[in-house]
UniProtKB/Swiss-Prot annotation:
GO function term, MF aspect, one: zinc ion binding
Organism phylogeny: Bacteria, Pseudomonadati, Pseudomonadota, Gammaproteobacteria, Aeromonadales
Known pathway: Carbohydrate biosynthesis; D-glycero-D-manno-heptose 7-phosphate biosynthesis; D-glycero-alpha-D-manno-heptose 7-phosphate and D-glycero-beta-D-manno-heptose 7-phosphate from sedoheptulose 7-phosphate: step 1/1
GO CC term (a single one): cytoplasm
Compartment(s): Cytoplasm
InterPro entries: GmhA/DiaA, Phosphoheptose_Isoase, SIS_dom, SIS_dom_sf, SIS_GmhA/DiaA_subfam
Main localization of the protein described in the UniProt heading: cytoplasm
Cofactor: Zn(2+)
CDD domains found in the cross-reference section: SIS_GmhA
Domain called SIS: residue spans: 37-192
Protein name (Swiss-Prot/TrEMBL): Phosphoheptose isomerase
NCBIfam families according to UniProt: gmhA (TIGR00441), PRK00414.1 (NF001628)
SUPFAM superfamilies assigned: SIS domain
Function comment: Catalyzes the isomerization of sedoheptulose 7-phosphate in D-glycero-D-manno-heptose 7-phosphate.
Species whose genome carries this gene: Tolumonas auensis (strain DSM 9187 / NBRC 110442 / TA 4)
Length: 192
């Protein structure tokens, strides 16, 4: 009954991934991001990740893979998802949702840390505000975006952009693959 729809969804996902892979800059950006994050962790820094909705879940997944494990046993790495419900509700109520991530970076971020922002549109104002706060504190910025990069295009030290202009779920599917590759490369960098 739905077999053709299922196949169509898988083929569309396959094409979005093929288009992403075909751009060598995407591969280079993933490598640069992993190297940047690994250098911060090696020097005692931390990675703070953030996103909204499904991207928030991806930010939590990234931090969990750092503090827990990916494929192999190894020491835990300093990864924090900006996801504490009391922080999010307090800052949203007292300052506005635009500041939920930046306020956290202002409180616990240090020069040499890294912020990972995830936004399928590249237009999430709270992540843009966090980028501004991060840069003011000497925190390096990596962003995962989609479409044309939105307002975040050009703001980060490293942008990994999925140039897909359809539904956001296709972008999220590639973001999670990128996250897993980042973790794998970070582990390799820190194993030497």
């Amino acid at each position: 009954m739905y077999q053709e729809l299922i196949k169509q969804e898988l083929v569309t996902a396959q094409q979005a991934l093929a288009d992403f892979i075909a751009d060598a800059e995407n591969i280079n950006a993933i490598e640069r991001a992993a190297t940047l994050i690994a250098a911060s962790l090696r020097d005692g820094g931390k990675v703070m990740s953030c996103g909204n909705g499904g991207s928030h879940c991806d930010a939590m997944h990234f931090a969990e893979e750092l503090t827990g494990r990916y494929r192999e046993d190894r020491p835990g790495y300093a990864g924090i998802a900006i996801s504490d419900p009391s922080h999010l509700s307090c800052v949203s109520n007292d300052y506005g949702y635009q500041y939920v991530f930046s306020r956290y970076l202002e409180a616990v971020g240090r020069p040499g840390d890294v912020m990972l922002g995830i936004s399928t549109s590249g237009n999430s104002q709270n992540i843009i505000t966090a980028i501004e706060s991060a840069k003011a504190k000497g925190i390096k910025v990596v962003v995962l975006t989609g479409k044309d990069g939105g307002k975040m295009a050009g703001l980060a030290d490293v942008e990994i952009r999925v140039p897909y202009f359809g539904y956001a779920d296709r972008i999220q599917e590639i973001h999670i693959k990128v996250i897993h590759i980042l973790i794998m490369l970070i582990e390799k960098e820190l194993a030497v």
